[in-house]
Amino acid sequence: MKVAIVFLSLLVLAFASESIEENREEFPVEESARCADINGACKSDCDCCGDSVTCDCYWSDSCKCRESNFKIGMAIRKKFC
């Protein structure tokens, strides 16, 4: 019985690590060239890379990509870009 539990645990661990590896988000070269990193120049939220990064024009004349305080709302908004 203990052997079966250990075997099933290893099996679940193997599948979990494989699914995590498949879900890693890597930007293709073309997509990373189209979007700006943190502190990069932007005109709208869609210009910034990542689901939780927003275009911030509040503090200065030049807009820059910044980490958003509302990560869930920003992730939903980025789906429509």
Curated annotation (Swiss-Prot):
Q: Give the range the annotation lists for the signal sequence.
A: 1-16
The yes or no answer to whether the keyword Cytoplasm is present is no
Picking any one GO molecular function of the record gives: toxin activity
Q: Which residues form the propeptide?
A: 17-34
Tell me the compartments it is located in. Answer: Secreted
> Where does the entry say this protein is expressed, by tissue?
Expressed by the venom gland.
Q: What biological function has been recorded for the protein in this entry?
A: This insecticidal neurotoxin targets two types of channels/receptors. It reversibly inhibits the N-methyl-D-aspartate (NMDA)-subtype of ionotropic glutamate receptor (GRIN). It inhibits glutamate uptake from rat brain synaptosomes, and blocks GRIN in hippocampal slices. It also acts on sodium channels of both insects and mammals.
Annotated family? Belongs to the neurotoxin 03 (Tx2) family. 05 subfamily.
Remarks, miscellaneous: Protects against glutamate-induced neuronal cell death in corticostriatal neurons from both wild-type mice and the Huntingtons disease mice model (BACHD). In addition, it also protects neurons from Abeta peptides, which are the main components of Alzheimer's disease amyloid plaques and are very toxic to neurons.
Which protein are we looking at? GAMMA-ctenitoxin-Pn1a
Species this chain originates from: Phoneutria nigriventer
